[in-house]
Curated annotation (Swiss-Prot):
Residues 370-379, 446-455 have a biased composition (Basic and acidic residues). Homodimer. Interacts with AGTR2. Interacts with PTPN6. It comes from the Eukaryota. This is Microtubule-associated tumor suppressor 1 homolog. The modification Phosphoserine is found at residues 375, 380, 393, 621, 1143, 1164, 1185, 1195, 1199, 1201, 1203-1204, 1208. The gene is Mtus1. Belongs to the MTUS1 family. Residues 381-398, 473-482, 585-605, 692-702 have a biased composition (Polar residues). The keyword Ligase does not apply.
Amino acid sequence: MNDDNSDRTEDGSRYVFIRDKNSNPSEYYQTSLSAQCPSVSHGDWNSDNPDAMVVDYEMDPAVDSSESVSLSHQCVEELAYPEPSSDFMGKHEFTMYSELTCQSPALVNTGKPQDLHSNCDSLEAIQDEKFDPLKPCECRSDDDYACGDSPEVLELKQTYGMKVDTANYTFIARHDIEQGQPLHAPGGLQTTVRDRNALSSCGRTPPHSSKMYVRGVNYNRENFENLQATPSKTLNTTFTVISDVLMQTDSPDVGVQGQNSLGNVTKEYTDGTRRGLIGEKEIQAVTLVSDGMEVPNGSASQEFYCVSEDDPNSETHSHGPYAQQEMGQNLRGTLPNCHVDGECPVLVPAFEKSKTRVLGSECKVTVTEDPHIDSHDNDSDIQSSTEELTLRSVSGQRGSPYEMGWGENGGAICTDKAGCMSTPVEQPPNLSFRLEPAEVKKYNNVENGPRDAKRAPNLKGEPTNMPKPNLGKSATKTNTTVGSKVRKTEIISYPTPNFKNIKAKVISRSVLQPKDTSIMKDTPSPQVTGGSSPSPGPSKHLTMMNKAPRSDFKASKKAEIPINKTHKQQFNKLITSQAAQVTTHSKNASLGVPRTTSATKSNQENVDKTGSPHAGSETGSVAAFFQKIKGILPVKMKSSECLEVTYVSHIDQISPEKGEQDGEAPMEKQELGKQATNEIFESKSLLVGSAPKTSTTPGRSSSKPDSRSLRKTPGLKAKVGPTAACLRRKSESRTLGSDRALSPQRIRRVSGSGGHAAINKYEEKPPKQAFQNGSGPLYLKPLVPRAHSHLLKTSPKGPSRKSLFTAFNSVEKGRQKNPRSLCIQTQTAPDVLSSERTLELAQYKTKCESQSGFILHLRQLLSRGNTKFEALTVVIQHLLSEREEALKQHKTLSQELVSLRGELVAASSACEKLEKARADLQTAYQEFVQKLNQQHQTDRTELENRLKDLYTAECEKLQSIYIEEAEKYKTQLQEQFDNLNAAHETTKLEIEASHSEKVELLKKTYETSLSEIKKSHEMEKKSLEDLLNEKQESLEKQINDLKSENDALNERLKSEEQKQLSREKANSKNPQVMYLEQELESLKAVLEIKNEKLHQQDMKLMKMEKLVDNNTALVDKLKRFQQENEELKARMDKHMAISRQLSTEQAALQESLEKESKVNKRLSMENEELLWKLHNGDLCSPKRSPTSSAIPFQSPRNSGSFSSPSISPR
């Protein structure tokens, strides 16, 4: 119904449904700690108190893991029931102990399991143990359960006060451990378990005011619809306790520790007369999951049925799956029938301590007497008791899913069948069972072999690989478990196929079983490699319970002949033929043709009409079809493949007119996926209860006429009626959705190139059925019709073909099983009216018509699957053609490669020759270069020596010439320099003298102007001070005047006050005068306040006036100072102009000085010429020359010095 069923939780838990003698159902979830921590269940019965049953789950200390469970705090809740309204005096006490370590929601990290004793007192505390306290939850009208926290240990005590004997039943069940915590199994196996269980304690109050507090796990995935506790008068009590456990394999051959035990159930007689082990089941189911793989939900459940036979209204205590879990494993074991007289005709298979090495296995034994079970499921009760032994092995390995049959001596014999397992089998699996009543049997499955740490099993998070035997065998086991005394237990177990998410792997599920030996002989039982969900077929009459199963088992064994065909056309013919056969069977079922010729024909008329015998025939046909498929496609599964099994249970709400009946409908999907070995059991919330009224199908009723009449409760009709109508609407809408979008044959082929298997979704929803049994119609509503199987990684090898064939097989089985998936097997009294049968027949016809349309839809889907298969063949042919082309290209390329190699050899030889020639040439070249270098060096040295000689000679000549000239120039320059220095010093002194005079004049003028400005400033300051003093005096005078006026006014006020006081005294008796006086006083006060304010304002005005005067004076002063500053600026400007003029004059003087220096130079040159002439000239007049030359030399100097003005420094 809900697509998010697999997404709601990732945990595994159990939902327990408990019934008292008044058929008051109660539910609770419990999670199993033994999913990581192995648990051993010990059941104790006393012959004195034969109904006392103790089921103790003890944690197996053999498992070596990093964490263990610490459960020290017990949470006890007693469920007290009043006296039953029947001829039995019953007192029901349900005590549930939940040992809690912490309050955090359902976080349990268990690695090192400890012993959990029967009293649930001691569990060794270890790290990271988190349990949640158990919180009560009440069933609401909207069918939602309020969730509490996860109980870790549940102990149910029920004490019955009966006429025959009293019965005390104590169930101690362990909860699922949390997912997400590593379980370190020996052999490098790490188990990661996550648990997000939200516990649901469902407290329900029956109409007769009996109190039922129920604890359980609510996964928030389903709304359990109208789960009403209906009191009945049949005194049948059913306990359904589901336990998710890792089962322990007890095999001496394999020395792997880390054994996980499902439970040991012992029957113990305290009087010492008889003390035997009724059933001991040690089953190992370890989930191996590759990293990063998502898997659908799974559930682990353990089912115990204990029936007290001496009373005609016996009590059934059944631990049945009643939870929907996403990550876990579904391990269903049933407790043998326990009778009051101490006799238990139990068929408990004992695994021989054999050589098998099964990776994940399951043994399921359902042994029930036929109490009327009230359950809210799709289907009704099943009359016969069932025993289902299922060995679940992992894909990829040839294991031994065993099948159980009946030997000549009445014992059960297990035939070895080959199963697919993921781990290699060291020795061929050999499993044999011998099932006899009241004998100590032990299930010994092989321990876990050494596994990779990489393939860490996610016990709750990954799919479980558990192949189960064919359903033909399960039907025989169903019939064989109950002896002559077992007459009262019916288990409604209808597998509801959920093909929502199925990979293209081997997928198979069980179908309904035939009840007659003749039908079993006609139908070959398939050899199921993937596993099949145990669904007990229509129950036989009680007289045939011990005889019919053996013949059925033999007939089914004879019919199991694998047909080996490998051709594709043969496979398609098989598919079409099987589809036609299924169609004919469904049509016969819809027409209600009886085909059962058993001794119980009187009680099975309606059973035959519902098509229960055809279920077996269809089962046989599907089985043969599956055998043929196995023969056609014998593909070896790889070790990485995984077999995914999903149990889906549906809850259907039944109308109160028919009583609320819950059928147990586990649906098993097995999928072989590569890259991992995964085990998952997904139990879609399965409600098991005892029906308060007569069953819907009278043909399936037992020989008890009283059990139906006692359960008739008209009081509940008014309560459950509207809810039943609502359920009917919901079921109609859901059935339409299932017929349209979620058909069981939607096959999605595997994409082999990507290495991942696409999800093949199969989902089958049974249409709504309305059954009428005497009083009113019975509506069955599928509550959880589908489960999700997540994508598993697969290698693109052979299993893809096999998965496709098995997908067709599962679809074929879904087609066969859908018309009968809603068959209701209940107990009806033999005195049912014929009118009721006719009404039921009409309803069945309408149902079959609706189902015939669904079958046509399935045919269409099958044809589509055939077309898809043909498309796959075309793709394969295309790939083969491409492969041939690639081979051709490979040949051509190989030839080219050979030719290229030859060329390479020739080229390499030529290259070697060339390298040798190059080496010779290089040596010759180096010798020649060396010779040239030597010759060049000799020539260069000779030329260098010559150049040095020439250079040195020339340098000596030039140096001598240069030295002579340099001396001459030095003497001349020295003379000129001395002359210039003397002239410059004279001019400098003159300029400095003139400049100092000018500076002194400027200083004098500045001082005079500054003194004048200071004088004027002082005069202004004095005048301002005088004005200020005058104004202060005037203001003081005004202040004095105001003060005098104020004093006068105060005196007047005082006199007036005195007058008013006198007046008040005179007119004290006049109220108006008093009022006026008060007014005057108030006015005076106001006037005083105003006067004060005015005075303050006057003071402020005075200050403001003073400030104004000061400001005006300051403004005037500021103006004056600004004027003075402007005058000073003007003077500075004048000084600047004068300094500029002086600088220009100085520049002119410098120019004239330069001119004079030039003239001096010229004169000196002339002087030198004259001197030279004197030395070299005429000797006659030597005296004239110096005098004449001295005069011109001096005259220009003197003229220049006197004419040049003095230059003052700037």
